[in-house]
Protein backbone atom coordinates (compact mmCIF):
# COMPACT_ATOMS: atom_id res chain seq x y z
CA UNK A 1 0.00 0.00 0.00
CA UNK A 2 1.04 3.60 -0.47
CA UNK A 3 2.46 5.40 2.54
CA UNK A 4 3.53 8.82 3.77
CA UNK A 5 3.89 8.80 7.57
CA UNK A 6 4.73 5.13 8.08
CA UNK A 7 7.44 5.02 5.45
CA UNK A 8 8.96 8.31 6.58
CA UNK A 9 8.89 7.26 10.24
CA UNK A 10 10.68 3.98 9.52
CA UNK A 11 13.28 5.59 7.27
CA UNK A 12 14.05 8.49 9.63
CA UNK A 13 14.25 6.15 12.64
CA UNK A 14 16.53 3.72 10.80
CA UNK A 15 18.88 6.43 9.59
CA UNK A 16 18.94 8.07 13.02
CA UNK A 17 20.28 4.74 14.30
CA UNK A 18 22.82 4.48 11.47
CA UNK A 19 20.96 1.82 9.49
CA UNK A 20 20.70 1.74 5.71
CA UNK A 21 17.27 1.58 4.06
CA UNK A 22 16.04 0.15 0.74
CA UNK A 23 12.49 0.86 -0.43
CA UNK A 24 10.90 -1.80 -2.65
CA UNK A 25 7.73 -0.71 -4.40
CA UNK A 26 5.40 -3.52 -5.46
CA UNK A 27 5.14 -2.23 -9.02
CA UNK A 28 8.92 -2.10 -9.37
CA UNK A 29 9.82 -5.47 -7.85
CA UNK A 30 9.04 -9.15 -8.44
CA UNK A 31 7.29 -9.62 -5.09
CA UNK A 32 4.12 -11.62 -5.62
CA UNK A 33 4.43 -11.42 -9.42
CA UNK A 34 7.35 -13.58 -10.58
CA UNK A 35 8.48 -14.59 -7.10
CA UNK A 36 6.45 -15.92 -4.20
CA UNK A 37 6.36 -14.24 -0.80
CA UNK A 38 8.07 -17.31 0.67
CA UNK A 39 10.99 -17.09 -1.76
CA UNK A 40 11.20 -13.31 -1.43
CA UNK A 41 11.37 -13.62 2.35
CA UNK A 42 14.26 -16.08 2.19
CA UNK A 43 16.20 -13.83 -0.19
CA UNK A 44 15.64 -10.56 1.66
CA UNK A 45 16.30 -12.21 5.01
CA UNK A 46 19.82 -13.02 3.84
CA UNK A 47 20.48 -9.45 2.71
CA UNK A 48 18.82 -7.38 5.43
CA UNK A 49 18.74 -7.31 9.21
CA UNK A 50 15.02 -6.49 9.32
CA UNK A 51 12.04 -6.05 7.00
CA UNK A 52 9.07 -3.68 7.24
CA UNK A 53 6.01 -4.68 5.21
CA UNK A 54 2.98 -2.56 4.38
CA UNK A 55 0.24 -4.10 2.29
CA UNK A 56 -3.22 -5.62 2.22
CA UNK A 57 -3.19 -9.15 3.63
CA UNK A 58 -2.20 -10.02 7.20
CA UNK A 59 -1.28 -13.46 5.89
CA UNK A 60 1.42 -11.89 3.70
CA UNK A 61 3.31 -10.22 6.54
CA UNK A 62 2.96 -13.40 8.61
CA UNK A 63 4.43 -15.47 5.77
CA UNK A 64 7.33 -13.01 5.51
CA UNK A 65 7.92 -13.35 9.23
CA UNK A 66 7.79 -17.15 9.03
CA UNK A 67 10.46 -17.49 6.34
CA UNK A 68 12.68 -14.39 6.49
CA UNK A 69 14.75 -15.41 9.50
CA UNK A 70 14.99 -11.75 10.59
CA UNK A 71 12.55 -9.44 12.43
CA UNK A 72 9.59 -8.39 10.29
CA UNK A 73 7.63 -5.26 11.21
CA UNK A 74 3.99 -4.84 10.22
CA UNK A 75 3.68 -1.32 8.81
CA UNK A 76 -0.05 -1.84 8.14
CA UNK A 77 -2.35 -4.51 6.76
CA UNK A 78 -6.11 -4.54 6.31
CA UNK A 79 -6.41 -6.20 9.71
CA UNK A 80 -3.84 -4.44 11.92
CA UNK A 81 -1.66 -1.34 12.27
CA UNK A 82 0.63 -2.15 15.23
CA UNK A 83 3.30 0.49 14.66
CA UNK A 84 0.59 3.15 14.69
CA UNK A 85 -0.41 1.80 18.09
CA UNK A 86 3.04 2.64 19.46
CA UNK A 87 2.49 6.23 18.35
CA UNK A 88 -1.06 6.33 19.68
CA UNK A 89 -0.10 4.96 23.09
CA UNK A 90 2.77 7.44 23.40
CA UNK A 91 0.53 10.33 22.34
CA UNK A 92 -2.16 9.44 24.88
CA UNK A 93 0.47 9.10 27.60
CA UNK A 94 2.00 12.48 26.73
CA UNK A 95 -1.28 14.36 26.46
CA UNK A 96 -3.23 12.50 29.13
CA UNK A 97 -0.81 13.12 31.95
CA UNK A 98 -1.57 9.84 33.69
CA UNK A 99 -0.69 6.15 33.30
CA UNK A 100 -2.31 4.38 30.37
CA UNK A 101 -4.08 1.91 32.65
CA UNK A 102 -5.94 4.92 34.07
CA UNK A 103 -6.79 6.28 30.62
CA UNK A 104 -10.03 5.96 28.66
CA UNK A 105 -10.58 6.39 24.95
CA UNK A 106 -13.24 5.79 22.32
CA UNK A 107 -13.00 4.82 18.67
CA UNK A 108 -16.03 5.85 16.62
CA UNK A 109 -16.76 4.95 13.01
CA UNK A 110 -16.09 1.81 10.97
CA UNK A 111 -14.38 -0.50 13.47
CA UNK A 112 -13.91 -3.58 11.27
CA UNK A 113 -10.46 -2.83 9.94
CA UNK A 114 -6.92 -2.11 11.09
CA UNK A 115 -7.51 0.89 13.36
CA UNK A 116 -10.60 -0.43 15.10
CA UNK A 117 -9.02 -3.87 15.57
CA UNK A 118 -5.67 -2.50 16.71
CA UNK A 119 -7.06 0.06 19.16
CA UNK A 120 -9.26 -2.62 20.73
CA UNK A 121 -6.29 -4.94 21.22
CA UNK A 122 -4.05 -2.07 22.36
CA UNK A 123 -6.52 -0.99 25.02
CA UNK A 124 -6.93 -4.57 26.21
CA UNK A 125 -3.19 -5.20 26.48
CA UNK A 126 -2.50 -1.96 28.33
CA UNK A 127 -5.37 -2.29 30.79
CA UNK A 128 -7.23 0.73 29.43
CA UNK A 129 -10.90 1.70 29.34
CA UNK A 130 -11.58 1.27 25.61
CA UNK A 131 -14.89 1.95 23.89
CA UNK A 132 -15.93 1.09 20.35
CA UNK A 133 -18.80 3.19 19.01
CA UNK A 134 -20.04 1.80 15.70
CA UNK A 135 -23.09 0.23 14.05
CA UNK A 136 -23.16 -3.42 15.08
CA UNK A 137 -22.46 -4.52 11.52
CA UNK A 138 -19.24 -2.50 11.57
CA UNK A 139 -17.80 -3.87 14.82
CA UNK A 140 -14.55 -5.87 14.88
CA UNK A 141 -14.95 -9.57 14.13
CA UNK A 142 -16.07 -11.96 16.86
CA UNK A 143 -12.57 -13.41 16.91
CA UNK A 144 -10.94 -10.03 17.56
CA UNK A 145 -13.48 -9.19 20.27
CA UNK A 146 -12.95 -12.57 21.95
CA UNK A 147 -9.17 -12.12 21.85
CA UNK A 148 -9.47 -8.64 23.37
CA UNK A 149 -11.77 -9.87 26.12
CA UNK A 150 -9.38 -12.71 26.96
CA UNK A 151 -6.48 -10.28 27.31
CA UNK A 152 -8.63 -7.86 29.30
CA UNK A 153 -9.31 -10.54 31.90
CA UNK A 154 -5.58 -10.61 32.62
CA UNK A 155 -4.88 -6.87 32.45
CA UNK A 156 -8.03 -5.45 34.03
CA UNK A 157 -8.96 -3.54 30.89
CA UNK A 158 -12.57 -2.47 30.45
CA UNK A 159 -14.01 -3.10 26.98
CA UNK A 160 -17.28 -1.61 25.76
CA UNK A 161 -18.88 -2.01 22.34
CA UNK A 162 -21.97 0.06 21.62
CA UNK A 163 -23.95 1.35 18.67
CA UNK A 164 -24.54 4.62 20.55
CA UNK A 165 -21.75 7.13 19.80
CA UNK A 166 -22.70 9.39 22.70
CA UNK A 167 -22.51 6.46 25.11
CA UNK A 168 -19.14 5.47 23.65
CA UNK A 169 -17.52 8.85 24.29
CA UNK A 170 -19.02 9.60 27.71
CA UNK A 171 -16.22 10.45 30.13
CA UNK A 172 -13.32 9.55 27.83
CA UNK A 173 -10.04 11.42 27.53
CA UNK A 174 -9.54 10.73 23.81
CA UNK A 175 -11.79 10.26 20.80
CA UNK A 176 -10.32 8.41 17.80
CA UNK A 177 -11.69 7.95 14.32
CA UNK A 178 -10.48 6.93 10.86
CA UNK A 179 -11.61 7.24 7.25
CA UNK A 180 -14.90 5.60 6.35
CA UNK A 181 -13.66 4.11 3.07
CA UNK A 182 -10.30 2.34 3.07
CA UNK A 183 -7.57 2.22 0.45
CA UNK A 184 -8.57 -0.03 -2.44
CA UNK A 185 -12.34 0.19 -1.91
CA UNK A 186 -14.44 1.53 -4.82
CA UNK A 187 -15.94 5.02 -4.85
CA UNK A 188 -19.38 3.47 -5.17
CA UNK A 189 -19.22 2.42 -1.51
CA UNK A 190 -19.22 6.03 -0.23
CA UNK A 191 -23.00 6.53 -0.22
CA UNK A 192 -23.55 3.33 1.77
CA UNK A 193 -20.90 4.26 4.35
CA UNK A 194 -22.16 7.81 4.74
CA UNK A 195 -25.68 6.51 5.36
CA UNK A 196 -24.36 4.04 7.95
CA UNK A 197 -21.93 6.35 9.71
CA UNK A 198 -23.33 9.88 9.55
CA UNK A 199 -24.24 9.75 13.26
CA UNK A 200 -20.64 8.76 14.11
CA UNK A 201 -19.03 11.82 12.58
CA UNK A 202 -16.76 13.57 15.08
CA UNK A 203 -18.33 16.98 15.51
CA UNK A 204 -18.10 19.58 18.25
CA UNK A 205 -21.33 18.13 19.61
CA UNK A 206 -19.87 14.64 19.87
CA UNK A 207 -16.74 16.01 21.54
CA UNK A 208 -18.96 17.84 24.05
CA UNK A 209 -20.91 14.62 24.68
CA UNK A 210 -17.80 13.27 26.39
CA UNK A 211 -18.49 15.69 29.25
CA UNK A 212 -14.74 16.27 29.43
CA UNK A 213 -13.64 19.81 28.48
CA UNK A 214 -10.08 18.49 28.04
CA UNK A 215 -11.01 15.66 25.66
CA UNK A 216 -8.59 15.26 22.74
CA UNK A 217 -9.22 14.22 19.14
CA UNK A 218 -7.00 11.63 17.42
CA UNK A 219 -6.79 10.33 13.85
CA UNK A 220 -4.06 8.22 12.23
CA UNK A 221 -4.33 10.32 9.02
CA UNK A 222 -4.90 11.04 6.24
CA UNK A 223 -8.25 12.59 7.18
CA UNK A 224 -11.10 13.96 5.09
CA UNK A 225 -11.80 17.07 7.13
CA UNK A 226 -12.32 19.69 4.40
CA UNK A 227 -12.37 20.25 0.63
CA UNK A 228 -8.63 20.80 0.19
CA UNK A 229 -7.93 17.45 -1.49
CA UNK A 230 -9.24 15.98 -4.74
CA UNK A 231 -11.21 13.35 -2.85
CA UNK A 232 -12.47 15.89 -0.32
CA UNK A 233 -13.76 18.13 -3.11
CA UNK A 234 -15.34 15.15 -4.88
CA UNK A 235 -17.12 14.16 -1.65
CA UNK A 236 -18.41 17.71 -1.21
CA UNK A 237 -19.67 17.92 -4.79
CA UNK A 238 -21.24 14.46 -4.67
CA UNK A 239 -22.64 14.26 -1.13
CA UNK A 240 -22.56 17.83 0.17
CA UNK A 241 -20.20 17.02 3.05
CA UNK A 242 -17.38 19.43 3.88
CA UNK A 243 -15.37 16.98 5.93
CA UNK A 244 -16.45 13.39 6.37
CA UNK A 245 -15.43 11.43 9.47
CA UNK A 246 -14.46 14.65 11.29
CA UNK A 247 -15.38 18.29 10.83
CA UNK A 248 -12.83 20.97 10.08
CA UNK A 249 -13.84 22.69 13.31
CA UNK A 250 -12.77 19.72 15.43
CA UNK A 251 -9.73 18.82 13.34
CA UNK A 252 -8.23 22.32 13.58
CA UNK A 253 -9.28 22.94 17.19
CA UNK A 254 -6.91 22.90 20.17
CA UNK A 255 -8.40 19.48 20.99
CA UNK A 256 -6.87 18.03 17.84
CA UNK A 257 -3.54 16.32 18.53
CA UNK A 258 -3.31 14.44 15.24
CA UNK A 259 0.02 15.93 14.17
CA UNK A 260 1.72 15.03 17.45
CA UNK A 261 0.22 11.57 16.96
CA UNK A 262 1.49 11.35 13.38
Curated annotation (Swiss-Prot):
Binding site for L-ornithine: 114, 178, 182-183
Pathway given in the UniProt record: Amino-acid biosynthesis; L-arginine biosynthesis; L-arginine from L-ornithine and carbamoyl phosphate: step 1/3
Tagged with keyword Cytoplasm: yes
Effect of residue 26 to P: In strain: CCUC 7757 and LCDC 845
Compartmental location: Cytoplasm
Keywords, sorted A to Z: Amino-acid biosynthesis, Arginine biosynthesis, Cytoplasm, Transferase
Effect of residue 150 to R: In strain: LCDC 77-143
Impact noted for substituting residue 199 to N: In strain: CCUC 7757 and LCDC 845
Catalytic activity: carbamoyl phosphate + L-ornithine = L-citrulline + phosphate + H(+)
Primary location class: cytoplasm
EC number in record: 2.1.3.3
Spans traversing the lipid bilayer: none
Single GO term (MF): amino acid binding
Site entry (Important for structural integrity), positions: 94
Enzyme class, first EC level, given as a word: transferase
Protein family (similarity comment): Belongs to the aspartate/ornithine carbamoyltransferase superfamily. OTCase family.
Protein name: Ornithine carbamoyltransferase
Organism, scientific name: Neisseria lactamica
Amino acid sequence: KTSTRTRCAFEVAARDQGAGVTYLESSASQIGHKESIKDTARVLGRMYDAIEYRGFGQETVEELAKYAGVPVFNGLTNEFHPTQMLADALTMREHGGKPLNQTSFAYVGDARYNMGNSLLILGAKLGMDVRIGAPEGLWPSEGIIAAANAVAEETGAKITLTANPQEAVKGVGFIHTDVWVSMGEPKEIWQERIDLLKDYRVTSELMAASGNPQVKFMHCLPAFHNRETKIGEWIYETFGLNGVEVTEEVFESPAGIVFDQA
